[in-house]
């Protein structure tokens, strides 16, 4: 099974890169995780945020692989406990499907990207900075894997 994280934003701070890399290297070999970074659309004081989000959404839709199940990370999505995420992960593994997780930019996900998602998942009711979401997401995926493997990390 393959998980692709499709995220708006490149040139993350070093602490984000290090945090993400730490958990990505811990992932089990049978669960390949790939980060796909998309450029942030130009924004200025007078720019049209909706246009920027639309451009990011188009790039995101183009990056989604054929046959991938699409999960959008959105504050209005359904919250899962870590145990529920582990159950979902086990279900996805059993189905043999590949899937992608969408992380929006500073203004969130474009409506077109949200519409493409079969699942909308909320990591938290809090508004989180998109760089931090990368670390939270990969850590929760790793934690879910440890639950499935009865590894003591989750205890």
From Swiss-Prot:
Keywords: Cytoplasm, Methyltransferase, rRNA processing, S-adenosyl-L-methionine, Transferase. It is an enzyme of class 2 (transferase). Its EC number is 2.1.1.177. It holds the Pfam family SPOUT_MTase. Signal peptide: none annotated. The keyword Transferase applies. SUPFAM superfamilies: alpha/beta knot. The keyword Electron transport does not apply. It catalyses: pseudouridine(1915) in 23S rRNA + S-adenosyl-L-methionine = N(3)-methylpseudouridine(1915) in 23S rRNA + S-adenosyl-L-homocysteine + H(+). Homodimer. Specifically methylates the pseudouridine at position 1915 (m3Psi1915) in 23S rRNA. NCBIfam families: PRK00103.1-4, tRNA_RlmH_YbeA. This is Ribosomal RNA large subunit methyltransferase H. It comes from Cellvibrio japonicus (strain Ueda107) (Pseudomonas fluorescens subsp. cellulosa). The lineage of its organism: Bacteria, Pseudomonadati, Pseudomonadota, Gammaproteobacteria, Cellvibrionales.
